[in-house]
């Protein structure tokens, strides 16, 4: 689904800054949404190397750009340029959405809320009183674990190849939110033990992401149980080998497409004040992944 965009002197500009950005699905997703609602907006992708971040952000504000999505490697560095941060951005320690408003640079993080909205939509999952096992300890794992913790999760286990990094995240979760959290390695037996009474498994690593779709998953069907929800944050491909393992186990598989769409929908609403056409955005993403 290619989207033609009409631009005039009154078109509102939003966009993405990162390095690199050429494979991003965000322009297709947002421009489809603007067209659906008849909004005079255009979404562009800007490749900004780290040494030019401050100039790009301040220049965008001066040019009257409405807002920006922020991706790797700028999510942490851009925080220093923001005049205001929302609670999620402060907790997670990263910004993925910027809004230029009233002469200020406002920073938000919609990743955690996008993750939870997608999960609730597909499974009716309620984090309260639950146990989750998170694979990975990077930016996506931080967003997911802090959102689960602030929404009432009882226990969060961070599993990472570098256990020290997982331990730092677990300590932050305990200190900032007061949730029961601990760290483990990626040893299969240890993960299997933790999954026995877990409600949710989230893979926040790039394992299985295009072009490495055939990479073996970190968890297999024999380590899962049928009451487990398995959410792979990888969205390309939409159906990963981990999700195939979940199906074999009778568990509930959840693709990463939903988180991508909902974090974008939340940014859309911050910029436009309009309710995002989520299904149009989802279809635009899936069309580009086919």
Swiss-Prot record:
Binding, NADP(+): 136-140, 160-165, 233, 256
Q: What pathway is this protein said to act in by its record? A: Metabolic intermediate biosynthesis; chorismate biosynthesis; chorismate from D-erythrose 4-phosphate and phosphoenolpyruvate: step 4/7
What is the top EC class of this enzyme, as a single word? Answer: oxidoreductase
Extract one GO BP annotation from the record. Answer: chorismate biosynthetic process
For the ligand (shikimate), the binding residues are 24-26, 71, 96, 111, 235
UniProt keywords (A-Z) are:
Amino-acid biosynthesis, Aromatic amino acid biosynthesis, NADP, Oxidoreductase
Look up keyword Secreted and say if it applies. Answer: no
EC number(s) reported in the record: 1.1.1.25
InterPro entries, sorted: Aminoacid_DH-like_N_sf (IPR046346), NAD(P)-bd_dom_sf (IPR036291), SDH_C (IPR041121), Shikimate_DH (IPR011342), Shikimate_DH-bd_N (IPR013708), Shikimate_DH_fam (IPR022893), Shikm_DH/Glu-tRNA_Rdtase (IPR006151)
Task: Enumerate the active-site residues.
Answer: 75
SUPFAM superfamilies cross-referenced by the UniProt entry: Aminoacid dehydrogenase-like, N-terminal domain, NAD(P)-binding Rossmann-fold domains
Q: Which GO terms describe its molecular function?
A: NADP binding; shikimate 3-dehydrogenase (NADP+) activity
Q: Which reaction does it catalyse?
A: shikimate + NADP(+) = 3-dehydroshikimate + NADPH + H(+)
What the protein does comes down to:
Involved in the biosynthesis of the chorismate, which leads to the biosynthesis of aromatic amino acids. Catalyzes the reversible NADPH linked reduction of 3-dehydroshikimate (DHSA) to yield shikimate (SA).
Family, per entry: Belongs to the shikimate dehydrogenase family.
Q: Assembly and partners?
A: Homodimer.
Q: What is this protein called?
A: Shikimate dehydrogenase (NADP(+))
Gene that codes for this? Answer: aroE
């Amino acid at each position: 689904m290619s989207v033609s965009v009409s631009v005039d002197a009154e078109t509102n500009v939003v966009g993405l800054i990162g390095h690199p950005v050429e494979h991003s699905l965000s322009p297709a997703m947002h421009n489809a949404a603007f067209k659906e609602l008849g909004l005079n907006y255009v979404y562009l992708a800007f490749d900004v190397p780290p040494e030019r971040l401050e100039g790009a952000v301040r220049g965008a504000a001066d040019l009257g750009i409405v807002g920006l999505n922020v991706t790797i490697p700028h999510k942490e560095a851009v925080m220093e340029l923001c005049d205001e941060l929302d609670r999620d951005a402060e907790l997670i320690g990263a910004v993925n959405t910027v809004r230029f408003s009233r002469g200020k640079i406002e920073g938000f993080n919609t990743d955690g809320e996008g993750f939870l909205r997608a999960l609730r939509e597909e499974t009716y999952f309620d984090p309260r009183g639950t146990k989750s096992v998170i694979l990975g300890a990077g930016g996506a794992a931080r967003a997911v674990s802090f959102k689960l913790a602030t929404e009432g999760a009882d226990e969060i286990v961070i599993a990472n190849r570098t256990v020290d990094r997982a331990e730092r995240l677990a300590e932050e979760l305990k200190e900032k939110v007061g949730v029961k959290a601990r760290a483990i390695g990626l040893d299969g037996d240890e993960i299997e033990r933790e999954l026995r009474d877990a409600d949710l498994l989230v893979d926040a690593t790039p394992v299985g992401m295009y072009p490495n779709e055939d990479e073996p998953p970190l968890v297999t069907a024999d380590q899962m149980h049928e009451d487990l929800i398995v959410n792979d944050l990888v969205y390309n491909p939409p159906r990963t080998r981990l999700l195939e393992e979940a199906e074999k186990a009778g568990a509930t598989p959840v693709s990463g497409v939903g988180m991508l769409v909902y974090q974008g929908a939340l940014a859309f609403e911050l910029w436009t004040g309009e309710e995002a056409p989520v299904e149009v955005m989802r279809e635009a993403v899936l069309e580009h992944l086919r």
